[in-house]
Amino acid sequence: MSALKRMMRVSNRSLIAFIFFFSLSTSCLYFIYVAPGIANTYLFMVQARGIMLRENVKTIGHMIRLYTNKNTTLNGTDYPEGNNTSDYLVQTTTYLPQNFTYSPHLPCPEKLPYMRGFLSVNVSEISFDEVHQLFSKDSEIEPGGHWRPQDCKPRWKVAVLIPFRNRHEHLPIFFLHLIPMLQKQRLEFAFYVIEQTGTQPFNRAMLFNVGFKEAMKDRAWDCVIFHDVDHLPENDRNYYGCGEMPRHFAAKLDKYMYILPYKEFFGGVSGLTVEQFRKINGFPNAFWGWGGEDDDLWNRVHYSGYNVTRPEGDLGKYTSIPHHHRGEVQFLGRYKLLRYSKERQFIDGLNNLLYTPKILVDRLYTNISVNLMPELAPVEDY
């Protein structure tokens, strides 16, 4: 009888332990699914100490090589991903003097005296009315947020595309921060907010494709920046022009402790020339929910023969605006799609996209509303 009681006590403890671990694991899985951005941030913070240690060891070796190489300069601006020598051989940074004289007939320089470096990032909420009032004094800003310098010829005509849903508190902060920076950089630019309506999961990549097509109908842009609304640059020397290779601007996010999460990370803020974006057939349309579309874009870029460049040093630092709502659900099918990136590249992208937009032009941006559904981007078998 006593043996039976002992067995029942053991069974009860085992049952309680099983229920506890089952509840804990299901809670964790639910959290990861419904709030993947937060979950990944916490996971990355746990891993960050190990990454920082490895980076410090790498930096020591890097500095030793720089010291022993007489032909190497320290204050570089750009380095291409994937090039073995690019970690050490970088171009020097030279910014023009304050008394530099511009010419309306000559291209604007890329390194202007007004670009001082560190920016004070204020993420305090502000109303759109206040932001409109602040920029109402600037008569050179045309409807849609279009602006071009008058004292020199802009080196790039930049369309800034912003995928959007339910982030109304972020937009005014974004414009308050970005407009002065792009004006300092003497770029011609305008903003396109692509807003997803309806009940389908958020499709960031498809919104970018819609925004690209509509922006090309609006003006003759030659550079396109794909910009999350909650990322604010911390350095005005992070030049928002394009180049011979696609550009990943947001190399160091504060929510990732200013460490690149992984080599192929291409999220947050990226830029391609119009020619480059068309060559890779844009973003994939099949990623519904959180995650995967940037990794697929990275694959498309490399399959098309490009490398990715990033700002050097602290130029690529960004602050993330805090969220006051739950993020998008995780897209569980992304890994299968990523396995077939190459096969899908030219059957899913700009060339299979159908949509009906509603366009409203605000003083500071063009709003493109679109109800996205999977049947708007039919994909052939692959």
Curated annotation (Swiss-Prot):
Tell me the superkingdom of the source.
Eukaryota
Per the record, pH dependence is:
Optimum pH is 7.2.
- Glycosylation site residues: 71, 75, 83-84, 99, 122, 307, 367
What GO molecular functions are on record for this protein? galactosyltransferase activity; metal ion binding; UDP-galactose:glucosylceramide beta-1,4-galactosyltransferase activity
Assigned EC number: 2.4.1.-, 2.4.1.274
Co-factor requirement: Mn(2+); Mg(2+); Ca(2+)
Q: What family does the database annotate? A: Belongs to the glycosyltransferase 7 family.
Q: What is this protein called?
A: Beta-1,4-galactosyltransferase 6
Query: What species was this sequence derived from?
Result: Rattus norvegicus (Rat)
List the taxonomic lineage. Eukaryota, Metazoa, Chordata, Craniata, Vertebrata
Q: Could you tell me the gene encoding this protein? A: B4galt6
